[in-house]
Amino acid sequence: MLSSFCGDGHPFSTGLPNVSICAQHTVLVWVPAAFFLLTLPFLSAQCHLTAQRFARLPFSAHFIIKLLLVAFLAANSLATWCYVLFSKNSYAAAYYVYPGLWVLVWTGTFLVHLIRLRCGLVSSGIQHVTSLIFLLCGAPEFYQWIRMENSNSFPNDLTTTDSAQFLSIAYLSWYSALILYTFSLCFADPRGAKTDDEKASSKSAASPELQSSFLNRLTLWWFNSIPWTGARRDLEIDDIFELNERSGTEFLSELWESFWEPKRLKYIHDTSIWAKKDPSEQEKDPVVIPSVVSSLFMMFRWEFLLASTLKFVSDTMQFASPFLLHELLNFISAKNAPFWKGMALSILMFSVSELRSLILNGYFYIMFRMGTKIQTSLTAAVYKKTLLISNSARRDRTVGEIVNLMAIDVERFQMITPQIQQFWSCPYQITFALVYLFITLGYSALPGVVIMVIFVPMNIISSMIVRKWQIEQMKLKDERTKMVNEVLNGIKVVKLYAWEVPMEAYIDEIRTKELALIKKSAMVRNILDSFNTASPFLVALFSFGTFVLSNPSHLLTPQIAFVSLALFNQLRSPMTMIALLINQAVQAVVSNKRLKEFLVAEELDEKCVDRSVNIERSHNAVRVENLTASWDPEEAAGEKTLQDVDLTAPRNSLIAVVGKVGSGKSSLLQALLGEMGKLRGRIGVNGRVAYVPQQPWIQNMTLRDNITFGRPFDRKRYDQVLYACALKADIKILPAGDQTEIGEKGINLSGGQKARVSLARAVYQNLDVYLLDDPLSAVDAHVGRHIFEKVIGPNGLLREKTRILVTHGLTYTKMADEILVMLEGKIEESGTFEHLIKRRGLFFDFMEEYKSGSDNSSEAGGSQDDDFEAIGGEIQDYMNPEDVVLTVTNDLDETIRTPELTTQISTMSSPEKPPTGTSPAAATESQNKLIKKEGIAQGKVEIATYQLYVKAAGYLLSIAFIGFFIVYMTLQILRSFWLSAWSDEYDPDSPSAHPMAKGWRLGVYGALGFSETACFFVALLALVFVGQRASKNLHGPLIHNLMRSPMSFYDTTPLGRILNRCAKDIETIDMMLPMNFRYLVMCVLQVAFTLIVIIISTPLFAVVILPLALIYLIFLRYYVPTSRQLKRLESVHRSPIYSHFGETIQGAASIRAFGKVDEFRQDSGRILDTFIRCRYSSLVSNRWLAVRLEFVGNCIIFFAALFAVLSKEFGWITSPGVIGVSVSYALNITEVLNFAVRQVSEIEANIVSVERVNEYTNTPNEAPWRIEGREPAPGWPSRGVVKFDGYSTRYREGLDLVLHDISADVAAGEKIGIVGRTGAGKSSFALALFRMIEAAGGRIVIDDVEVSQIGLHDLRSNITIIPQDPVLFSGTLRFNLDPFFTYSDDQIWRALELAHLKHFAAGLPDGLLYKISEAGENLSVGQRQLVALARALLRHTRVLVLDEATAAVDVATDALIQETIREEFKECTVFTIAHRLNTIMDYDRIMVLDKGSILEFDTPDALMADKNSAFAKMVADAAEQDKHE
């Protein structure tokens, strides 16, 4: 039938390398036509999706040319069809059908182009592939017509020469036009030109990806400009292409919410119904939390399906290589095989490999792009949820857990995405390979398959064991990082107490355990890797052994040996991958669980606070009725933070809220913000709300931006706010004025300055209702009075606003319109100041305590109630450890202006401080930042960095590692050539045919394989010791040097940057670098030995090595610097994501209160998009390289096969076995070439961690801890006589003096009060005593010992300080009191008793072994301060410094501390730095400092007697503040 249709008796026969005319006119026409028709729906969908995003394309010359070519192809097909239809000659049926199909296809193509123009689709892969298929299928007929024209012989079914000539000219012109058309599709149709506004909207270039043609995208040609730029200079962020709209945070966030939000709302609805059911029914019908994975699949289902299709095609095509290898070996073995067949096989091997490479790279490109989109979607979702989550849900999660959701769990989703298709791909590859093996070896393949199957559970079990150890190791790493974090947080206290040694020992102890687990995991992995690497050999050994021994007729020919070996090698990858997939899947399931639980967690109830404008609109701004609220409504039955609260705040009124610590004052403000769970009652707030938290929230931006907070800049309003908040003097000393970037959490501002910036932000917003949580507690008397008068009070800027002020400063309450007195979550009393005084109730008692409690100065200490503090404090301390860097320096002297601040600014910017009053515009950009941004490393990594790592690892171990790998590769090649000789011994024509006993062949093959495996294992064993030694020798000195670094280092270096060295960089050194070096050495050796094998097999191959190597090096020249810089950009732009996230968590309440949630989400989106731009470009650069290097690898395959064919054709003696070895090695080189370059790039990126760690290992150190021969006598100081003799000091060489010519003699046991206005030098005085800053002149002598002549530890361990902000560490209560374990339990209990903590400690479950949480968050502020007092009592040195140690506690606790100090330290010399003047009025002498000099130094009585003395004026200021009547 087909013969009749074609008019040919032999429809598919061919004697030459031709395709029959029948096939040309049937199959080769039907296939492309069918492809075109079947893909039309997909093309239609592509046009529809594109039309939603882009405008219509303009008519361009390029488009018109394509349209004309398609029109010609259609017209030519129509002419051919008409000629055949209306010709007088008779033709076979096929001649009538195929032109008609052409007309249909090309007419359809013409219409598709017009539709594509309208839809804005610049290029279509479907059209390009269709034209390529037409081109390939038409090639045989094109060749046929040319051959017939040359020979002037035509087929029998063409009856006349004229008809033959017409059809010949028609087809040749048609095919020529098809070539031109296919070439034109290599270029995309241009879009319309951008407008000037669009060009100016971004500094970075728009990505050309979406404007590129299909071939351009397939080869990633559009990315060329990035490597081109990267090879010429270091890349900058502006060089990186912008993300496409659908890869950006804004689009993906909306897409995520469209799929996730309905599921979340349904879950909440179902949960509310479920909660009402009986417990028995609840167990039977639990509510299932919606899966994150299902939502992600729905978002990216079409991309996923496209990638699946590509993966399926790629996996199928990989089995073409063994088939073609089999045919090539058959060709080599056959004596009379035609030369063209060998050439065709060579071309086919190259074409199939190159096509598979392009398809596989397309698959990875899609999946990696999907991974970045998933990362963007989930990161944005976690960020948004953080701003909406309720406090009760938030309390169940530490900050670390929330950060890990973004840093680890989201990252896992991104990393597993490219591998997710392997779950179906691996079984498919295994099945296909097994079928092929059974065809090749029969049942002899079974032993090999059984071995590979055994490896699967072995891999799984080993992975589970390693995973268990990895979890333990991660816990130890977290514990070590947390401890380093805490030590660096409290580094000033650590140094003041001389605790560096026990802290370093504690960290080293954790590190030793961590390294032990890393070693155990590595050993198991190495055993597993050795088995996996040996698996092809073991499988081949048993399979070949079974094959040749089971039947004497079974001959191990090259075709069987090397095709089977190729299949075994292809089996190894999916078999090994299964265990990794299971491991990754388990991690992904855990991450999915953690993410979905967080994303469905309870959110703040927006309806909790009624913000309707109609609430008491005529008069009241705030109305609270019968409010009962709790931080955890689900556990409200046990504890209610607020109970039965009624509150009315008229418009423009000032309401003062007072009460003891923990009475619920801060909780009341939180309830008004909607932050607490409302159990019953009603809250109404009329107007926009501003919130000033007790712990100031400062962003990492300029001072001005912190104050304007997104509002337009209004100079007049701004200046008013600066003056009212007493910030003008501060701005004058900043290097760039208010344009100075003040660092994370305002690291270089004092507590008082941060409080005033926080207040200024709220005032500048000009809102309606102000909730002020004790904003005056951090400032001293005259500043507090100024702020109250100019901002809060009846005549302040907020006089026309409603103000609810929480305060411990009872002197401010007189001017309040109403006072609320809180006790245990209830409003006990309310009324005006006069009314409450007359009632002589709770408020009157407070006033009495206030008057008699030694604090009538500028502020009364206060803190949040414990419930709120548990949340706020955790965020503050965990996320931004830098906050405590200047605790002593700043909090000793916190207000308008401090020389210490000026000095630190100078330290961080330039040696020359700008003159006071310098215009911000005149300041250089470098002066704007107090903390400099971390620089991006540029250029190549120095060879010295590699030498440093090798030196740390040990030279002998490094040489052993490389040496055993060389032996391993040598044995592998010997084994391959032994197999070659074995397979050739049955070929009588082979020059290497030397028959041997099968047992001997098998034995030697096995011996070589086992020796090879042993060498591989020993090499890996050496690598384990290399990594362990390097890790130990790099981490230990780093920690030691950090302990030895002076405070100036910590003043100018954000702790986050230091922590990055101790955490991320050390992890890279531990885990990544050993693996990088392993794979690099393996790849380099494998490439080198492969080339050697091919040259030995076919010496002619040496001719092409040089050009191929040149091409390879050119690609390296462009890729390596580009990849290196992209990795660095990615690393640098990753940090802002977490910094901004940390700021957001810390300031979530403020962000919600000010209504800035959407703005912060947009800011987070911009930061995230910048990072994703870098990561996406880095991933694309890998694919860009892979496309090009795999082309080089495929060229090696082609030349290896080609020279084998030429060797046979020209009589160069080459056996099939040797050719089998050569081509087998060549088939494996493609991925190795790419992987080798990737490893070079990875090592360059990761070795930077060694450089960064070494940088902080060699920073300048402070003075020695101990000086041999200069140790003070035991018991020193025994008297406590302190002498300052002309003492001067500065913070660093070259900076201004902060203390000038201080001379003072302090007798033993004397009590000295140190006071002064802000900037007087009080904090510098305390730091100088402990040598935290060194003398620039003069000396300090304690008991006849000059302190500069002894070691720092000898000094600091023998004098004591009680800081204002007590620092506690994770560990037991005992460890926090006595880390050296110097004192007995009885002594510690005695100290706790004297510190009024014994009753508390005795009631703890574990007593002295009670676990203190991070930063001591499970103790109240007052309890932490008492622990600091207990430390001082334990040490009981003769010299004691009190750094305003009672500022953060209430009056009662203050009285306890003062009483204990007076009693227990009555024989000691005491220096008290005080803002509260009443605490020092009974001291022996008062030292008044001013501008770094002693202004006055006399007894309190003498100074008070002189009414013109500075001290007398300070007391008068405080007294003025205390007037109540």
From Swiss-Prot:
Residues 622-849, 1282-1516 form the ABC transporter domain. Residues 46-66, 116-118, 187-346, 456-535, 583-953, 1027-1068, 1112-1184 are cytoplasmic. The keyword ATP-binding applies. Keywords: ATP-binding, Cell membrane, Glycoprotein, Membrane, Nucleotide-binding, Repeat, Transmembrane, Transmembrane helix, Transport. InterPro entries: AAA+_ATPase, ABC1_TM_dom, ABC1_TM_sf, ABC_transporter-like_ATP-bd, ABC_transporter-like_CS, ABC_transporter_C-like, MRP, P-loop_NTPase. GO terms for molecular function: ABC-type transporter activity; ATP binding; ATP hydrolysis activity; ATPase-coupled transmembrane transporter activity. CDD domains: ABC_6TM_MRP1_2_3_6_D1_like, ABC_6TM_MRP1_2_3_6_D2_like, ABCC_MRP_domain1, ABCC_MRP_domain2. This is Multidrug resistance protein mrp-7. It comes from Caenorhabditis elegans. The gene is mrp-7.
